[in-house]
Every structure is written in C-alpha cells, then in structure tokens.
C-alpha cells in the first residue's frame, strides 16, 4: 500500500497545482476588473518618464498592449497569468523531484509558500512573483543537474 501511494504523489501534486492555477486565474480575472486594485499600478511602472528601475515589465506591457491593440489592463492580466502559471508549474517540476524528502514537502505545502498568494488576496498579482520565479528556476536547474 505504501508503494502505491508513493507512486501517485506526482499526480496528486499535479492536481493540486492545477487547482491552484485555476483558482489563481479566476481571482486574477476578478481583480483586474476592479478599479482600485493596487497591484495593477505596480505593473505599470515604465520608461516613459525616463529611465526608472523596475520599469522594464511596465514598458513591455505597454508595448504589448499597443502592438496587439489590447486594453492595458488586459495585457497586464495576461502577463500576470503567464508568470503565475509558469511559477506554479516550475514548483510542480521541483515537487516531482523531492518526493522522498518529507520536510521539504511539509514546508512547500505550508500556507506561507504555495497558498500564500491565493490566501492573501492583496499580495496576489504583484511583481514579486518574478523574484519567486527566478528562485524556483534556480532550484529547478540545480535539482536537474
């Protein structure tokens, strides 16, 4: 019985990550229509007033919006969904590699790591996901080597 449960862990992780992505996309879509969402303004920092650090993503969102004739809020929503989804699938690939380490599994499933953006709506959709994406990418590369 124990062996069968261990073989199913990757599928459990995948279902868990897919649920998080589904709920995350739903929350992001709901938040992007609200007029007073402060996370949108963080993504809008750009280079139109001169060189500003942290302005690259905002400039890319504006250019993306102009090129494809999207509303700016919609292009930022697409960026948020893209980075959010990539982040969680990288976490899934890491989870597949650390099945045996129970301490890592416990820390990953703690509410402060994976569930935090969904549990705390005000923190959801912020640009910090890019930093987390870089960290998770680093771990993913190190685990595969």
Can you describe what each PLM-predicted range is?
Residues 38-43, 72, 115-116:
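Short linear interaction motifs
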Residues 1-23, 99-104:
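Start-transfer (signal-anchor) and selected internal transmembrane alpha helices
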Residues 26-41, 48-60:
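Extracytoplasmic catalytic/substrate-binding loops of multi-pass membrane glycan-assembly enzymes
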Residues 78-100, 136-140:
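Transmembrane-helix motifs of polytopic, lipid-linked glycan transferases
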Residues 92-114:
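Transmembrane-helix signature of polytopic, membrane-embedded enzymes
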